[in-house]
Regions:
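N-terminal amphipathic, basic helical "cap/leader" segment at the start of enzyme domains
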Residues: 1-85, 89-95, 188-190
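Small-aliphatic-rich amphipathic alpha-helix that forms the alpha element of a beta-alpha
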Residues: 46, 86, 102-144
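A glycine-rich helix N-cap at a beta->alpha junction
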Residues: 79-85, 146-169
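Phosphate/diphosphate-binding glycine-rich loops and adjacent basic-rich segments that engage nucleotide
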Residues: 168-190
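A short coil-to-beta-strand element that immediately follows conserved catalytic motifs
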Residues: 56, 128-132, 152-153
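Glycine/charged-rich beta-loop-alpha catalytic/anionic-binding loops adjacent to active sites
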Residues: 69, 95-107
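Residue-level "edge-of-site" marker
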Residues: 59, 136-138, 155
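Short secondary-structure boundary segments
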Residues: 90, 135, 161
């Protein structure tokens, strides 16, 4: 079981930052399938991350062991023993209708990334782990899930209950932060 957000009297803002602190990419899971209520909460989290217009994002919640096994064999980057998958997809036709070419190439990807991020932050609050998977061929994923040509798979989220002794995350990750202009270090201004 992964660390979960402590049930304290902290403010909602503190709870969000604690969930961010606990966020991990898990690559080894137990064989136990997370409960339907947990998967429903992840779907809810993805829905709250909306960047694009309604109807652009589609989610496929995959729990059929045979289908998960097919994904495992067909997608080289897939986490080997995750018992569930959420496939985040974009409707390119609808995106083009309501937002034009930029909607297709930029907004759909931002929308899918936001959904993946919200799922990732929600996971430790539910006692589960996730891992974003992006190493696969679009056509293969479309074929596995029967996606029409105008539905593009964006991200596969491996979902499961992490093993007890999972590796600790790399500490100290921080992006390069600039102030006002590229090359001006943010820390020099504080």
């Amino acid at each position: 079981m992964t660390e979960s957000v402590p049930d304290t009297n902290s403010s909602p803002a503190e709870a969000v930052f604690e969930a961010m602190r606990l966020r991990r990419m898990h690559r080894v899971f137990t064989s136990e399938l997370p409960g339907a209520h947990v998967l429903e909460r992840l779907v809810y989290a993805a829905g709250r991350a909306q960047v694009a217009r309604p109807g652009i994002r589609h989610l496929i919640v995959v729990t059929d062991p045979r289908l998960v096994r097919t994904v495992r064999h067909a997608c080289p980057g897939f986490v080997n023993n995750a018992p569930a998958v959420i496939v985040i997809c974009s409707d390119l036709r609808k995106a083009h209708e309501v937002m034009g070419p930029r909607g297709v190439e930029v907004v759909t990807r931002l929308d899918s990334g936001a959904a993946a991020g919200y799922i990732t932050i929600a996971a430790p609050t539910l006692g589960i782990g996730v891992c974003k998977v992006t190493s696969w061929t679009e056509e293969v994923v479309q074929a596995i899930f029967g996606l029409p040509d105008h539905i593009r798979p964006e991200v596969l989220m491996a979902i499961g209950i992490p093993v007890a002794n999972h590796p600790k995350p790399v500490k100290g990750f921080r992006p390069d932060v600039h102030h006002d202009r590229y090359g001006q270090d943010w820390s020099d201004t504080r």
